[in-house]
Amino acid sequence: MLRLSLPPNVSMGFRLVTLVALLFTHVDHITADTEAETGGNETTECTGSYYCKKGVILPIWEPQDPSFGDKIARATVYFVAMVYMFLGVSIIADRFMSSIEVITSQEKEITIKKPNGETTKTTVRIWNETVSNLTLMALGSSAPEILLSVIEVCGHNFTAGDLGPSTIVGSAAFNMFIIIALCVYVVPDGETRKIKHLRVFFVTAAWSIFAYTWLYIILSVSSPGVVEVWEGLLTFFFFPICVVFAWVADRRLLFYKYVYKRYRAGKQRGMIIEHEGDRPASKTEIEMDGKVVNSHVDNFLDGALVLEVDERDQDDEEARREMARILKELKQKHPDKEIEQLIELANYQVLSQQQKSRAFYRIQATRLMTGAGNILKRHAADQARKAVSMHEVNMDVVENDPVSKVFFEQGTYQCLENCGTVALTIIRRGGDLTNTVFVDFRTEDGTANAGSDYEFTEGTVIFKPGETQKEIRVGIIDDDIFEEDENFLVHLSNVRVSSEVSEDGILDSNHVSAIACLGSPNTATITIFDDDHAGIFTFEEPVTHVSESIGIMEVKVLRTSGARGNVIIPYKTIEGTARGGGEDFEDTCGELEFQNDEIVKTISVKVIDDEEYEKNKTFFIEIGEPRLVEMSEKKALLLNELGGFTLTEGKKMYGQPVFRKVHARDHPIPSTVISISEEYDDKQPLTSKEEEERRIAEMGRPILGEHTKLEVIIEESYEFKSTVDKLIKKTNLALVVGTNSWREQFIEAITVSAGEDDDDDECGEEKLPSCFDYVMHFLTVFWKVLFAFVPPTEYWNGWACFIVSILMIGLLTAFIGDLASHFGCTIGLKDSVTAVVFVALGTSVPDTFASKVAATQDQYADASIGNVTGSNAVNVFLGIGVAWSIAAIYHAANGEQFKVSPGTLAFSVTLFTIFAFINVGVLLYRRRPEIGGELGGPRTAKLLTSSLFVLLWLLYIFFSSLEAYCHIKGF
């Protein structure tokens, strides 16, 4: 009889660990029974067996009865090989989870038809979050355990084994007790993490406990020792039933079924938002796959699409504001960086802060363990390098263009009628600058005519070696006739290149090569403004759109059809849907003064930036009647411009002094004011000559043009909106964890990256790899390169990677099952004990790290512990349900019964179920205000909870081992 005597002051934990160690030591001294017919590691015996049976893949290591030294060597080889296989499974599971992340991120486009007939296109996620967590996510994290159970049964002539089922139960115990204990402890003191979707947690926790209760029922109550076909199939069919129940809880269908639901387009990423309310008079229709469907059709969108509740809409709005804030801060902090680089920096910060899926944390944990680096930092650094390299490539393309391009510096030129000549600049860019380039030019009439408005000009411009810019001039003819603005064209043509030029500068026709062409623009438009009229004043267009982030907007007021004299034109802003006074814009009013020959002035208005993602408000800018302010005394009389004037020093008009009319804003010295009156006009009528002069003067008076009132539409910032939209598209974790090509996968496989999980660095810059990173990389580089052959997640929307990865996991799991069984029989451990302790621990290590990272980084506890319960239920329904259904059907077809010994498994299941009730009860109690959440809390509460959960796991291992070796009676 095994006895344990320890001093009374030794802790309970130490007692348990010592007892387990003595138990395993005692096992080695038990005399092994001879190999039974069913195999070497017989489960019905109370002792382990040193006689190994042939595995599914691995043969028996002969001889069967080695010496003690050989036994230690064999056990070491099996153990190291098993650990190495666990590393391989972790890495291929990384690829598997990447494919799942890509698959569950797929979106579908739908069209919403509004009551007014307008349609809006938007996208929704195809996979419901809860459904994906219970199906693909759970399958991804538990694939080794599930496949081990199936492979063990199918590989041993459809007979029941201990390794697969015990691994599932042992893994469930490790997940429920050790992983949750770690998550509770790693949250910083004073902080808490709550489960957000508590309804889903209740459902999955209930199903998890029911799953193991059901195992006990079919093993010990319904048909003791026999698994019938209906029991196996029902176990499997509990899986979709569990998924449906969790989905119903997530969608709140059982209660909300009686509340009318309306759907509207959310402002964020085009998500569809569901909320309760009264039934509207008009129907909103939704079009899916080309068909328009009424939005209130019963259960239309439930389940087929992901409908986000109003809370999600609010979260999305906050996310947009947060993106805008991050972009502005980064722009101020890094003013020298390109916009693409700023987007990548913002992308890293947003990805670091957003809630992530279980798949992401699993991938992150595996890559940190194997020296593949922090996935977010690596992605940010890669994208930043791509942005810089693309910018450099574009610059190189321009600078290293082998073809010489010749073009005008600008496509439009303006000049006054009295300017004499207008200068046009021709640019040469690219190609070999040591060559000589020739280009012809020629003027062409538009509304202006050669000979009367401008001088016809043609010729050839020669760019000598090294020259990149030339200037040509065209003469402008002035007259005293009032005319509309006119234009003419100048064309470039016939570009040719020569490497040799004669002494006279003439092209040597024997050395012409076609390595030059015309660039854009190759035609220039020259507009001639008449200077014989005071001008017509107008805005460029009746409506203009401005971004709210413009700050100070500038609006041009054009002076066309003349530019003679000084003219004042008043302006003011008028409210529309946009409000002045600093709410949407600053009220502005004043006067513009056009000097003689000045043809354009600008009005400045300050626009207030509200940082709104969507905006459409209007106000108006209006110009008033223009006033001629400088004229001769005679012209003032002709135009009836009477009143006070001041003499303008140094100005003459046709030999006569020029006077400036006094306005309210002027404050001249009273003694300088001259009064011009029409007293002489009252005495005698105007002569015909004076009448003609008055008519001409009236024709030259400044007037308003077509657009005197400009409508200004303030919209959201185009650059800001496009940047945020681009950032939103980039903040898709599927883009981070997915791969696009085999080349990318192989580069990633042979690259060592820093494994520090430090997400506080806002720039996401990669650090140098540590010694541990290099060691883990070289230990796992074989697996990394091997699994780089798996199809990238880009193919078939992730399904190609999904299928190949699960096949590879199945193959490695078969090896793990054989290695674990051979390791156990080599040292005399039963399969059930080996599975509960070693295999369950090995398959759960990546999940442990993933949950630890999720607990510290996520805002909620769902990603760290919320999926543990669902995963445990899925393990039973898929792992045991599929395996036992296949075996039961096989034996039933042969007229036999599928026998399963209820002893060890039933005892472990019962023990786990009791402890699971305690675990869930403690977690729910921790939601009370004094602690505040399932994870974290005050240090004392954390230590007590974590210690309790670890103690439950040790007790589970201890009692399961005692029962397996018949030290206590099971079922």
Curated annotation (Swiss-Prot):
Return the protein name: Sodium/calcium exchanger 1
| Reaction catalysis annotation | Ca(2+)(in) + 3 Na(+)(out) = Ca(2+)(out) + 3 Na(+)(in)
Chain's role: Mediates the exchange of one Ca(2+) ion against three to four Na(+) ions across the cell membrane, and thereby contributes to the regulation of cytoplasmic Ca(2+) levels and Ca(2+)-dependent cellular processes. Contributes to Ca(2+) transport during excitation-contraction coupling in muscle. In a first phase, voltage-gated channels mediate the rapid increase of cytoplasmic Ca(2+) levels due to release of Ca(2+) stores from the endoplasmic reticulum. SLC8A1 mediates the export of Ca(2+) from the cell during the next phase, so that cytoplasmic Ca(2+) levels rapidly return to baseline.
Q: Tell me the SMART domains matching this sequence.
A: Calx_beta
Q: Give Gene Ontology CC terms.
A: axon; axon terminus; basolateral plasma membrane; cell periphery; cell projection; dendrite; dendritic shaft; dendritic spine
Q: Which InterPro entries match?
A: CaCA, CalX-like_sf, Calx_beta, DnaJ_domain, Na_Ca_Ex, Na_Ca_Ex_C-exten, NaCa_exhngr1, NaCa_Exmemb
The UniProt keyword set, sorted, is: Antiport, Calcium, Calcium transport, Calmodulin-binding, Cell membrane, Cell projection, Glycoprotein, Ion transport, Membrane, Metal-binding, Phosphoprotein, Repeat, Signal, Sodium, Sodium transport, Transmembrane, Transmembrane helix, Transport
Q: Which Pfam families match?
A: Calx-beta, Na_Ca_ex, Na_Ca_ex_C
According to the record, the protein's activity is controlled as follows: Activated by micromolar levels of Ca(2+).
Q: How does it sit in the membrane?
A: Multi-pass membrane protein
Q: Which residues lie on this side of the membrane: Cytoplasmic?
A: 93-133, 189-201, 250-798, 844-872, 926-942
Principal localization reads membrane
Where is the secretion signal located? Answer: 1-32
| Molecular function as annotated in GO | ankyrin binding; calcium ion binding; calcium:monoatomic cation antiporter activity involved in regulation of postsynaptic cytosolic calcium ion concentration; calcium:sodium antiporter activity; calmodulin binding; cytoskeletal protein binding; transmembrane transporter binding
User: Where does this protein come from, organism-wise?
Assistant: Rattus norvegicus
Query: Which ranges sit in the Extracellular compartment?
Result: 33-71, 155-167, 223-228, 820-822, 894-904, 964-971
Residues that hold Ca(2+) 4 according to the record = D453, D479, E483, E486
Give binding positions for Ca(2+) 6: D584, D610, E611, E612
Q: In which tissues is it expressed?
A: Detected in heart, brain cortex and hippocampus (at protein level). Cardiac sarcolemma or brain, and spleen. Expressed in all regions of the kidney, highest levels of expression in the distal convoluted tubule. Expressed throughout the CNS, in decreasing order of abundance in hippocampus, cortex, cerebellum, hypothalamus, midbrain and striatum. Expressed in numerous regions of the brain including multiple cortical layers, hippocampus, septal nuclei, thalamic nuclei, cerebellum, hypothalamus, olfactory bulb and brainstem.
Residues bound to Ca(2+) 5 are E548, D610, E612, E716
Point out residues bearing the modification Phosphoserine. Answer: S282, S389
Calcium as a keyword of this entry, yes or no, is yes
Entry comment, domain topic: The cytoplasmic Calx-beta domains bind the regulatory Ca(2+). The first Calx-beta domain can bind up to four Ca(2+) ions. The second domain can bind another two Ca(2+) ions that are essential for calcium-regulated ion exchange.
The residues covered by the Calx-beta domain are 393-493, 524-624
Transmembrane spans: 72-92, 134-154, 168-188, 202-222, 229-249, 799-819, 823-843, 873-893, 905-925, 943-963
The UniProt annotation puts the region (Putative calmodulin-binding region) at 251-270
Sites where the protein binds Ca(2+) 3:
E417, D479, I481, E483, D530, D532
